[in-house]
Structure formats: structure tokens, C-alpha cells
Amino acid sequence: MALFRKFFYRKPPDGLLEITERVYVFDSCFTTDVFNDDKYQDYIGDIVAQLQCHFADASFMVFNFREGESQSLLANILSSYEMVVMDYPRQYEGCPLVTIEMIHHFLRSGESWLSLSQQNVLIMHCERGGWAVLAFMLAGLLLYRKQYIGEQRTLEMIYRQAPRELIQLLSPLNPIPSQIRYLHYISRRNVSAVWPPGDRALTLDCVILRNIPGFNGEGGCRPIFRIYGKDPLLATSNTPKVLFSTPKRSKYVRLYKKVDCELIKIDIHCHIQGDVVLECISLDADQQREEMIFRVMFNTAFIRSNILMLNRDEIDILWDAKDRFPKEFRAEVLFSEMDSVNQLDSMEVGGIGEKEGLPVEAFAKVQEMFSNVDWLDPTADAAALLFQQLTSSENIQLRKGLLSPNKKDFHLSSISPTKKQSDNVEDKLSNAELSTIYVHKQENNDVQGLIPQKQATIPDEKSGSSVIHEKMISLVHEEITQVVDINTGCLSSLDMTVPSTMNSSRPVLIDQNSKLDDQFGSLQSSSPTMIMSQQFPVSRSSSVLSSDFSPRLLSACPRFHSAPSALGITALLEDHAAFGDTKNSVKVSSAVVKIPSKQSSQQHPITVTPVVTKCTPSPPPLLPPLAPVVPVPSDDQMISQEKDMSQQAQKHPDLSSFPSLSPTQQKQSTSKLCQTILPTNHQLSSSNITKEPLQISPAPTPPPLPTPSTSSSSSCHCLPPDSMLSTTTALFRPPAPPPPPLQSPSTPRCSPVRTLASPPPPPAPTSSPVRMSGPPPPPPPPAPNSCPSRPAPPPPPPPPLASTSSPPRPAAPSPCQLHTSTSSPARPVPPPPPTLSTIRSSAPTPPLLPGATSAPSPPPPPPPCSSSNQLSAPPPPPPSFSKNNGSIAPPPAPPGGNAKLPGMRGRGPAPPSGPMSRSLQSGQAASRRSNLKPLHWVKVTRAMQGSLWEESQKTDEASKPPVFDMSELEHLFSAVLPSSDGKRSDKSGSRASGSKPEKIHLIDLRRANNCGIMLTKVKMPLPDLMSAILTLDDTILDADQVENLIKFTPTKEEAELLKGYKGDKQVLGECEQFFMELMKLPRVDSKLRVFLFKIQFPSQVSDLKRSLNIVNSSAEEIRGSAKLKRIMQTILSLGNALNQGTARGSAVGFRLDSLLKLSDTRARNNKMTLMHYLSKVLSEKLPELLDFPKDLASLELAAKVQLKSLAEEMQAINKGLEKVEQELTTSENDGPVSEIFRKTLKDFLSGAEAEVRSLTSLYSNVGRNADALALYFGEDPARCPFEQVVITLQNFVRLFVRSHDENCKQLDLEKKKALKEAEAEKTKKEPENAQKTKEPGNDKAKHNNSIKELDISLQSPAQTASAK
């Protein structure tokens, strides 16, 4: 069908651009030129005349996007041609969009008109300045009709039809993000049962800006907000108005810098409904000049989860302002249901006085202990003044009402179009409420300060001035003239509004009227002359124009005046017969230069001229690259190898005796040579091959070589032009062993490469065989396409090389030796130098490296049939040349020994000496060890000086290692079971036929192995796995398994590789079959990500909800703790006692970080701090406050929560829901394969949205509580966020508890010390008491002794003598 459309395609008339089938656009929409009335009428008339000749039986409808209430000039002109004209507004509050109702009306009208008859044609037109909305509506129509997929791609395709500078001229802001948002609304219309859904009345609570943009030159901004839309409190009025505007003169409109705060939170509390335009404007330092930060247009019916999260790519910004926004910029707009909006109570900062705390007199001793100690920061004077202001009775109230801006016209700066406020703004805006981060009352007298006078004026569109028009045209004049060359003129009015009436004499068909009534609903016509209109008056905003003028930013383009406009709809009834009767064959000479319109097909009408490339035939379906990549030798390496081989050839006179070929002969022979062997579809460009690595992988295991026959079929060896030398020494050269990278037991498959066109091959040249001197030749070989049916006995063992004679000079050199016979040994023709290899008796010629040949390696050849007369063993012809056994792969090379040509006499050629010889010998050694088990060591490639390995390389007999018995090694460490040679030859055929073919790997081997490991963990058949994915069954697959599946979804390159595979899919590897199965599902990667989100959604929501509850609990506990409040008041009294009589004294409050300075202020004896003293005083006088940490149970957990991370989690949940919704919409085009998937996903989405909506409400409440906590301590939420408040309190609590414990320990020590001292004193007094107790006994004894002595003295002398 596409071919028929191409043959029967008719170029559209001049002046029209075809967008898709039967949809055209006037080319005047792509220019800013202005026509006068006469020229414009001639321009339209010429196009209409061509249309009627081009589409003789067609009916036409014109959609016009214009401004104004009266009928447009286009409708007035086309009414005389019996064309239906429908007028739409070209903007909505300065944004090049229309309301969702207008979009729905346009889409239904366009779709119904085009589907009503195949002869109906739709034409789009816009007046000057309406190209942006016209492009959006065209993209919406294409998406609505499912002619294109992808919102951004479709919109960009439409914009490319006009010069790039046109949209930048017409719109100072980039409108594409908001337009894409509305295109999402259109493309996802099938998610909900009714589209468009009913307008939701919401309350816009606040706007949070994260990672502040820089708009003041100092890395910050001074933001204010304006909101435009329909007032939900006035159900009867659909007129948009200013719903909210931040007063400029408010003292809370201040500068926010990146270094001071990470986010800005602006409380708004404005009621909205339907289509809303939100503008964020940055004020200059003088609060007069305005600069647009961003603009967002959205519809409340499509707000999910009561939150709108935007990054810098999803907001309308100035064309050159993207660098002002950090990459991490986020704007969060939080909503709540209008009926359940909770008014925030006025928060008192708290009576931070001395009523409930200890009086100053209680700290009389502290002045002596902490005298002359600076415990406060010297810069804290400003903090004291701030607290005095914040605790005043006027400022602790949070909100009173919103100021109503006065109704005046004033223009924004050069970056914002103008708006007009409606008449009843003052009456309606009183219902909305304004608050910044900590919103306070505003007085009504601030209204006058909100509306300054104009500093400069911009010519209005209706003023008739053409100065601005000339400046606009001068910017894109060169580009516009390439599109159309029309003599421009100036109109006195840019808004072309002329009353339009339809021809009353035009007949009306009743049957068409009944059809169109059903299609167009409200567009019913009771009379042919009746014009149905709908009022769309648009209000203007209030702004100020800066004195500077920037033509690029279109300061001349005012904020599209949206005065009440009418949707003038001329009757939609068309009589096809009337068009046939009124056709006039009039020749009109067009005064307009014809514009070639772009041709297109029905499905993709808009085409871009492709880049002219060389005509290249498509290459044949070759096997895709397998593994691994062989490095391509450079040109220097190839030249050096050529020189080495030339020197080797000079050493052998028998090689240099051959006659040389002239360059012309070489070129001819080379071309003939390649054309003889390769078919046309196998020709490749060597220049392309040298730039692309050749990927090689082993082929299936080949069968062993049959016994050679005496007669064989020889084929010409294709020599590439790059490898041809000027002499035959390059052709007849000793073959070298194959390099190690190419050691393969079978013929590898080459990856398809890009080809260039080459002429078809001529017939193969006939060449007589070269006769050599020697014994008579054997019988001539059969035809090249034949092969012996039975094998012959092997030839006798070859004699030594020294006994052979050098071959004589050939009679006539031939570029392609088809048949040769000789009895003396002849050296085979080697491949080009980059691919030096020895032609083995059991393997064909090894593959050629890229760059060395212009053709891929031939397919697996038939079993070689060799004889003694063969000069070389070239590779057999491709499959098209072979008839028998052409698909049998060659056998592997035998382990050990030099490879020789089949049937050759004498020893094989010795490999060249030097480094190349060593490397080649090592490659041969590696091939000999291929049947042994590998030793997995870490190889050292370069011996360090003085190391053991350097010494081992010396030729010292003592250092030489012993010679190992290879047979013993093979017997002990063989990788495969050994088998006798006799049995091998006998059972070769049966083993080849019975062996299981190896798996073919198209994917990178490492990735394939990892994929196989992953599949072993899944442990289920692939069909069951696909079924689990489509049913989103989380009982079968868990999150880890789905994550692994996402990692192993095929990439775009892998998918293309697998699609190009045409062989048997059963022989593919496990990874390839898994990828094949995944590719059966459309957008399997997106489905798996949706599946993963569904599995993780409950845990994500529960974790986020738990964290939010912790923040709420901690904020409520801190604000509700009476003990903490009394302690704060006690600290205030303590500080005032210390600072009494100084500038820091008599404070009404203190900054929150001053709490930590209590531990830094030490007494003069350095034995205690103020924190210890505070604990001591509270223990003595207010002991009931010591357990205040028990009131802050959630403080520890709250200190671990970051509000930024909570915002990121909330954003991830919302983005995940958007992806779910997008996949649900896209999967409707998948067909029955995704039917269960859609049903399951729709059920999940309905429940998830309700849960996320409640989570968003909690998230918004947490944000308010976090800000209220900072305000509770008199802090600015922007400078002292919730995290800082909580961490400061946590550290204070820890320091207080530690100080209290230390005080308790110190008190215990003092008690013990006092006890010890008392005991010591008591012990000291006991000896004295004991001594005092002993002294009375001694006196008595002395008294007794004295009495005894007295008695003795009183005795008589006689008694004394008798006693002696």
C-alpha cells in the first residue's frame, strides 16, 4: 500500500504544508510577516482556488487560533467559499496552551470531521503569534488519532516544520515542558473511565524549592508567586483570574542564598480548580524589576497523590536560563483537598520569660563563680534583637488574610508577557491566604505598595505600532525568507477580527446535520447563518517592565492579551453536492512564491531528507559475531611483516625464479581472482573491514578428515588486492604457522560487515594448468564443483626436504592456479602477511584477519581431496559452488607436528626465525597442550631485572629445567579421554553424525555466563517466567529476582543481533533463548520495572510513613514538653544573671545553638561548667525537671531522619506511579498479550493512588510541623531546618544527662569523702579517750603503794628485826 501511495501521491497546493493525510497547515503560520487586508485576502483566495481544483469533491474545515472576541478576518474571507471555520484562543494566561475543555473539543471535532468522510480535509491556521499553540494542537491530534507514539518526539517533529528561531521569538519562555505535560494528559486518556475527568477543587498548600537557582548574581533569588486560574468558590464563573499574588512590599519577601539554606518553603494556601498557571518570579533588590524564574501550567484533575514534583526539565524557563538551575533542582507543589484543608493555628513563640523558671536572684552565686567569662558569642547581639522582634505581640500571629492587588494594567519585565487582572480580584482573593516560610499578618494598606507605576511601556498588539514588529522580523528574516517570500505589509491592528457570517443561501443537508450533531455535541446549528460562540476572556497579571530591552527575549511581545474571545463556529454542515455544483475552473496567478511541501506516506507523513550516502547493496545474511574480538593489525605492522617475508623469500632462489607480474596484471588478476571465488553477495570492502574488529568463535566440532584421494578438486585462493605484491615472491612464499589468536580447530564464522557497492563478478577465467618438470602427472582432477565419493588410501610418508629439487620456472604465470600437477614439492601459496599461517593437513586455511581481505571467510568446505600434483591447499569454494558435502566442517588439527599439505612430499616448511618464529612456536606449543588440563596460574609476561625468572632465561645448562615426558603428561592430565588412532578413523563418521551439536552463542560470553547463573537462581521454565511477569505475580518472583531480570534484559544492540539470526533457534545458548523469550513481550524492560515497583511499593510506603510519623511525634513531643519549656526559661534566667549590667543582659530569648555553649563556659576553678551548674541548681530547687528527657522519647530516632531523603523517597514513589500509569497507557496497543497485565496493573494503580494520596497529606503535615518546630524556638526554618533543631536538642540532652551524672558522682564522692573524714576523725579521738580512761587506775595504785609504805614505816623496830 505504501508503494501505491507513493505512486499516486499528489503534491499539496502551494501555500499549504501537509502534516498528515488530509491535514494541512497554512505556511503563513511559519512567519511573523503581517499582511494588509487586500494582500491577505488574495493570499487566502489563491490557496482556496488551488484547493478546490486539487480536491474537487472534498469538504473543508478550518481551525483558526487567534485572539479577540469578534469574528476573525480568516472566517470572514472563507465564509464566501463555504468553508467551516472554528476559532480557538491562542493562549491561556500567557501560556501557549488552551484549557483541557478546549483541547477535548478540538480533538473531538478534528477526529469526527476526518472520520466522517474520506473526502473531508482539515486545514490549520493561526494568526501572528499563535504558532506555539498550533504546533501543540497538531501534536495532540496526531497522538489522539494514534498516528504517532511519544509525546516529546511528536511535538519536536511538528516544531521542526518551522524555523527554530520562530518559537523563541514568539514565546519568551520555553513552553515545551508544559505542552508535554498536557500531551501526557491526552495520551493517557484511557487510564480513567471518563476523559477529561471532572475538575477537582484543591488547595495549593505550599511550594518547596530545593537547590535554589541563582537569579540575583549572588547565588540566590527573592521569589514571589502568582497563580492564575478559575476560582473554585465561584461555580458560575469560568473566567480565569489572579488567584494569588505575593505582596511585593511584604517584609517576608527576602533574599534566599544557596550558602544559607538548601530549600525554600513558601506557604500559599490558595484554592484552585481546573487549569492553573503558577508563576515564580524573582524580584530585584529594589523590588521593582521582575524576572521570571519558571512557569508551570497544569490541570487539577490530573494531579495524582496531591503532589506535583518537577525538575528543571519539567518547568517553563527562559530559553537561556537553564544554567542558572542546578541539576538537582526540584520544585514540589503540595496540595490538599479543598474541603478538608486545615487552617494552621497561630503559633505563639512561647512565653520565654521568667514566670515559670527560676528568678535571677536564684543565681546570685553564679555571678561570682563565672565572673568575667564570655560564654556567649560576641555576635549574639543581633540574635537578642531578633528575639525581641519575634516575641512582640504584633508578629507572633501567623496569618490574617491575603491582600488583593488593585485592578490595574502593568507589564512584566522583558522576560514575562503582560497580564491584566480581572475586575473582581479584590472581592475574590480574600478567600485565599498568603504566608511565606513563617507567614505573618499583612495589613490592607500594603495593597497600594503592591502595584507600582509603569517604568516603561510596551506597544500593545492593538496599538498599531510596527516598531516591535520590525525588530522581531530582523532576527529571523534570513531564515524566514527561505520558507516563504511574501511582500509584507503593516496592519493597523495585529488582531485581525472581522465579523463572520455564513452564506445564508447555502443549502443544508438534514442527514449530515443529524450526523454532526452526535459528533460535535454543543456545535448544533439551527440556522445556517447562526454563529455559536463561547466566551473566553482572559485576565492579565500585574507586573513591572524593566527599563532595558532585549529583542531576543521579545520584550516587545506583550503577555498575550487574552481579552474575552469567542469560539466562533460557523455551521459545520457541508453539502458535498453543493461543492460539486459550485466548482469554478478559474485560473488564478498566484502572487506567492511556491513552497515545496514535504511528501510523506500515510503513516508517517512528515519526513526528513535523509543524508545522501553511497548506494550499497545489503550484505547477505551472515552469522552474527560470536566472540572474541581479534585485534586488527595496523598498517605499520602489515608493512613490517611484508618486509620480513620478502627477506625470507630472497633467501630461497627457487621462489624468486618465478616471473614477476606487472602492477596492471596484479590488479587484473586480483579482481579476477576474487570474482572467481566469491559471489556478489559476499563481497566486502577491505577498507571497512580494517576499521572493524572481526569477531570469531569456534564452530561446531568438525568430523575427522577422510582419507585423501589421488584426484581432488582445487579451487582458487582469493588473494585480496591489499596483499598483492609486485612480484610473485609475494604469491609463492613459505607458509608460516597461524598466529596464536587464530588457533581454532574449525572454520570460524565472520561477523557481517558493512559493504560498498562493487560490480558483479565476471565469469571465471579459464587458465591452463602449470606443468612442472618431474614425473608424469596423475589423471586430471575432476571439475571444481565435484568431490570424490569415497576416500582413498593416505599417501606415503614424505621424504626429507633436502632430497627435493626446486621447482622449475612455470611456463606461464596465472593469477589463479585452477589445475596444477607436479611430482616435486612446491611451496603453497600463503595468505597475506597479516595472516601468516601454515596450511595444515587436517584444517583449511585459517581465517584472514580484517583488513587483509575484502571477503569474509568461506563457509565450511567439503572434505579436502588432495593429490600429489596440488601446488597448494586453498580453501574450497563457497556453498554455491559446491554440491556435495559442502556443509561438513573441516576436522581439527592433530596435536603436535608441523602441518603439511595433503599429499605433499618432504618435510613441511620451517617457520621463519626471529621473534616471529618464537611467537609462532609458542602458539604451536599452546596448540599441542590444548588436550591437557590447564594450570590456572597468574602468568608473568616480563621478567624483572634481578629476578629468578630473568636468570632462568639464561642459557645455562645447570639452570635448564628437566624435559618432561609429554606422553606421560597426556596420560595423567588429559582433558579428554584418550582413544586409539585406529578406532578414531573407524568411528569418525559415526561420532560425527551422532555427536550433539554445540550451542551457538551470539551474546558476549561473559554476559551469557552471568545470565546462565542468574537463570539457575530463578529455577523455572521460561514460559512460566513470562507468565509470572505478565500477571505481576509477586508470589513467584521476589524483588531480587526481578532486579536480576532487569539487569539481563536484552539491549538494543543485542535485540538487533538476535533478530538478524535466521538459523535454528534450538541450537542457541541458554542466554540467547532467554533473550528471545523476553523479546516476545513488548517493552519488557518497562514491564519489569513496573513489576519491581509493585513489589517494593508496600515496603516503600510503610518505611516512609514510619519516618514521617517519627518526625511528627518528635515535633509534637518537643513543643508539648512543659519541662523542657521551664528548663529553657531557667537557662534564660541564668544567662541574664551572668550578663547582668552588660549589653548581652536583659535578653528575652536566645538562639538554639547557645544551648551547647553551656558546656564550653567553665568556672574559674575549671572544675565545673555552666551545664554542671544548671544541673546542680535544678537538682536542688527544681528536681521534678530532671527527667525531662523522658518527654522526648522520639528525639533519638528523629535525629537519624533527613527530610531531604524523605522528599527523595516521596518523589521516587510519585515517579513510580507515573511510570505505572505510562506503561498502562502504552500497553493498550500491545494486544491480547498484555490483557492480564493491564487488568492487574489497573487494580494496583487504583489502590496505590489512594494510599499515596494519604501519604502525601501526611508528608505535607510533616513539613508544616517541621517548620513550626523551628518557629517555636524563634528560628528561621530556612536557616535552621528541622534536622539542625533536633540534633541541637539531642546534643543538649546528652550533655545535660552527662553533667547530671557527673554531678551525682561528684556528690557521691563528696559524701564518701566526708564519711571517711568523719571516720578518720573518730579514729583519731579514740586513743585519747582510751588514755583518759587509763589515768584514774594509776592514781589508785600509787595511793595503795603509798599506804603500804606508810604501814611499813609505822611498824616497830622489833618487828622489823624479827622479820629479817
From Swiss-Prot:
Q: What are the start and end residues of every segment in region (Disordered)?
A: 614-934, 976-999, 1317-1364
What is any Pfam family matched here? PTEN_C2
- PROSITE patterns in the cross-refs: C2_TENSIN (PS51182), FH2 (PS51444), PPASE_TENSIN (PS51181)
- Bias (Low complexity) ranges: 744-757
Which InterPro entries does the record associate with it? Answer: C2_domain_sf, FH2_Formin, FH2_Formin_sf, Formin_homology_domain, Prot-tyrosine_phosphatase-like, Tensin_C2-dom
Which residue numbers delimit the FH2 domain? 922-1322
Q: Where is the composition biased (Pro residues)?
A: 617-631, 734-743, 774-813, 856-865
Which SUPFAM superfamilies does the entry mention?
A: (Phosphotyrosine protein) phosphatases II, C2 domain (Calcium/lipid-binding domain, CaLB), Formin homology 2 domain (FH2 domain)
Q: Where is the composition biased (Polar residues)?
A: 657-690, 916-929, 1353-1364
Q: Where is the C2 tensin-type domain?
A: 199-338
UniProt KW Transcription keyword: no
Gene3D superfamilies the UniProt entry points to: 2.60.40.1110, Formin, FH2 domain (1.20.58.2220), Protein tyrosine phosphatase superfamily (3.90.190.10)
Q: Where is the composition biased (Basic and acidic residues)?
A: 1317-1351
Which keywords, in A-to-Z order, does the entry hold? Hydrolase, Protein phosphatase
The answer to whether the entry has keyword Hydrolase is yes
Domain Phosphatase tensin-type: start-end pairs: 9-193
A GO MF term: phosphoprotein phosphatase activity
Give the positions the UniProt entry annotates as the active site: C126
Q: Which family does it belong to?
A: Belongs to the formin-like family. Class-II subfamily.
Q: What is this protein's name?
A: Formin-like protein 6
- What is the phylogenetic placement of the source species in the record? Eukaryota, Viridiplantae, Streptophyta, Embryophyta, Tracheophyta
Q: Provide the gene name from the record.
A: FH6
